């Protein structure tokens, strides 16, 4: 009955859902619209230096092509969905135009594109690559093969923790969001965000892949994979980070970084020629 309702009647089934609808909707910030993060604005860090912006794309020849614009703070691990788009049976030109639009609006550091079969042509598109290269934006492929094909079931499901947990309301005994989400969604007034929320709350590993509506969920998953890499790398201990047990707090404070180019320029200026 659950599978029938989700696939053939396209109904949201809340019982034992992978993504709890209470948590997903509780992660939506009514005070944040879609668009780029603004330093110091609501729910945005004051210093944007540690924020990394990316866009995941799940392209398709037939059906929908999903775009998810995503940001992660490499220091705090906080995530934001900035916007989501989907195109129905798009032409290569329409996909190219949407990539250019996202690049101009959000200035992402990179695009992550599923690159199996037809999708590989998108990664190799010369016009797209020239446009992105002129703006310093990377285009990275995501390959689905025999070693990671279970990402669709286990990997996607692992994102459920990003939306936080529920607690029981003391008044009406109903589950409410605990406010502990790591991922923030903007208010769902746009078609892309609405569809992303619908795909999340109805997503189930029990439904065969060919019947799932998951274009935006997969584009979100590509971004989250990259976000985990960035957060893990930022927390890795570095030699210059003051992790030595033999350094006192005063010694750590007295250390600083120098620019070797500035030192070389200063030495060049002080050099006396005879």
Regions found by a protein language model. Name each.
Residues 55-65:
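Short acidic, Gly/Ser-rich segments with clustered Asp/Glu that frequently serve as metal-coordination loops
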Residues 12, 59-61, 117:
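Short, flexible loop/turn elements at secondary-structure junctions
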